[in-house]
Structures are given as structure tokens and as C-alpha cells.
Amino acid sequence: MENDGIRDICSIAGYSKDKVQAALQRSKHEIKPTQKHYDVLQVDEFHTFVGHKKNKVWLIYAYHQKTGQIVAFVWGKRDLKTAFDTVFADANERWVGKQHTKAIEGNNCAIRHRISRAVRKSCCFSKPLFYHIKVFNIGFAYINACH
């Protein structure tokens, strides 16, 4: 899980690529909020690549600083309205600006250390979006379990 791709896992564990991919396909990892209501959430986005460097995919996610958990995330275009309508459909709370983003920016760094597909100048990317989402689901579940 520490920044290892499918071929790295094959080499370390001695499994075939097909076996590792089958395990990813069967994976049921999902993040689930541990609370019904959060007092403050920080939201940020960053891009990753699927297939090739020209194909950017945006990840928009919500982070709770006090628990260190990733509460929700959505993949899509870098469209603020679409992201907030999807993730925070019921939210009527006030929004806080960029002055309070130190924690989530630090979390972005932690994500980049854990998931190689999130590294800015990486040669590691998923060919199909399906595997990309599976790897991030596992990575986020792992990050949440560590907190």
C-alpha cells in the first residue's frame, strides 16, 4: 500500500498480474463517515491522470481535521457547483475561505505519499478509471483506519 503499483505488488508478493487485478476487482473497500454530523469540514481538489498525462481526472474530497478522516469524495470535472451539489446536497452551513486550509493541504501530501497515482510528477497511473477508483478507495480506507 505504500505507493506500490500493481506490478510492484506482483513482484513483492509473487502473484501474477491477473491475480492482483482480480483482487482489486473484488475489493469492497469504501469510506464511511463515523459521525452523522461534522462541525467543520475542509474541501479540496487535486488532479490525477487516467490512461495518459493528457487525461486529467479531478478528485474533490472532504476532510475532517479533528479526526483526520476523509469523509467523502467524488470524481469528476473541476466544476465547483457540480462537486458541492454531489457531496454536500443538504449543506446550509457557512463556507470558510482559503485561510484555514493548512490541514487539508497537509493531508494532500499524505495522500501523495500513500497512493502513487496521486503523485504530481508520477509515471504511475491507472489505465482504466475503474482501477483508479478502486486504488483510491483502498487508500482512503487505509488512511482513515490509521486515524
What are the language-model segments listed below?
Residues 1-147:
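Residue-level recognition of single "structural anchor" positions
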